[in-house]
């Protein structure tokens, strides 16, 4: 009984300290980001590129080009090259840039964008 009470107490203490550490870390990150100068936009661009616009893995299989709305190439700062397709329903799909179908879809999207631009 004493062992289970001690284990439960220890677990509660670890949980409380862990959540406090997360709050402190979030506050420090926000503070440091607010101290970055907007003139140093390369740092911010790198921060966002690594977190948002890098592919950590590629989706398997093929993607119908008709489901795609746009694309962007990942930054050279990313650990892995990639193309991120945005689907018409808002999903982001990471694909290998060396895939032949990816190249075909990119060409199709470029042509569609040019046609839309000329109509306006």
From Swiss-Prot:
<keyword id="KW-1015">Disulfide bond</keyword>
<dbReference type="GO" id="GO:0048020">
    <property type="term" value="F:CCR chemokine receptor binding"/>
</dbReference>
<feature type="disulfide bond">
    <location>
        <begin position="55"/>
        <end position="94"/>
    </location>
</feature>
<dbReference type="GO" id="GO:0061844">
    <property type="term" value="P:antimicrobial humoral immune response mediated by antimicrobial peptide"/>
</dbReference>
<feature type="disulfide bond">
    <location>
        <begin position="54"/>
        <end position="78"/>
    </location>
</feature>
<keyword id="KW-0732">Signal</keyword>
<feature type="signal peptide">
    <location>
        <begin position="1"/>
        <end position="21"/>
    </location>
</feature>
<dbReference type="InterPro" id="IPR000827">
    <property type="entry name" value="Chemokine_CC_CS"/>
</dbReference>
<dbReference type="InterPro" id="IPR001811">
    <property type="entry name" value="Chemokine_IL8-like_dom"/>
</dbReference>
<dbReference type="GO" id="GO:0006954">
    <property type="term" value="P:inflammatory response"/>
</dbReference>
<dbReference type="Pfam" id="PF00048">
    <property type="entry name" value="IL8"/>
</dbReference>
<protein>
    <recommendedName>
        <fullName>C-C motif chemokine 23</fullName>
    </recommendedName>
</protein>
<keyword id="KW-0145">Chemotaxis</keyword>
<dbReference type="GO" id="GO:0008009">
    <property type="term" value="F:chemokine activity"/>
</dbReference>
<dbReference type="GO" id="GO:0070098">
    <property type="term" value="P:chemokine-mediated signaling pathway"/>
</dbReference>
<comment type="function">
    <text>Shows chemotactic activity for monocytes, resting T-lymphocytes, and neutrophils, but not for activated lymphocytes. Inhibits proliferation of myeloid progenitor cells in colony formation assays. This protein can bind heparin. Binds CCR1.</text>
</comment>
<dbReference type="GO" id="GO:0030335">
    <property type="term" value="P:positive regulation of cell migration"/>
</dbReference>
<keyword id="KW-0395">Inflammatory response</keyword>
<dbReference type="GO" id="GO:0060326">
    <property type="term" value="P:cell chemotaxis"/>
</dbReference>
<dbReference type="GO" id="GO:0005615">
    <property type="term" value="C:extracellular space"/>
</dbReference>
<dbReference type="InterPro" id="IPR039809">
    <property type="entry name" value="Chemokine_b/g/d"/>
</dbReference>
<dbReference type="InterPro" id="IPR036048">
    <property type="entry name" value="Interleukin_8-like_sf"/>
</dbReference>
<keyword id="KW-0358">Heparin-binding</keyword>
<comment type="similarity">
    <text>Belongs to the intercrine beta (chemokine CC) family.</text>
</comment>
<dbReference type="GO" id="GO:0008201">
    <property type="term" value="F:heparin binding"/>
</dbReference>
<keyword id="KW-0964">Secreted</keyword>
<feature type="disulfide bond">
    <location>
        <begin position="65"/>
        <end position="105"/>
    </location>
</feature>
<keyword id="KW-0202">Cytokine</keyword>
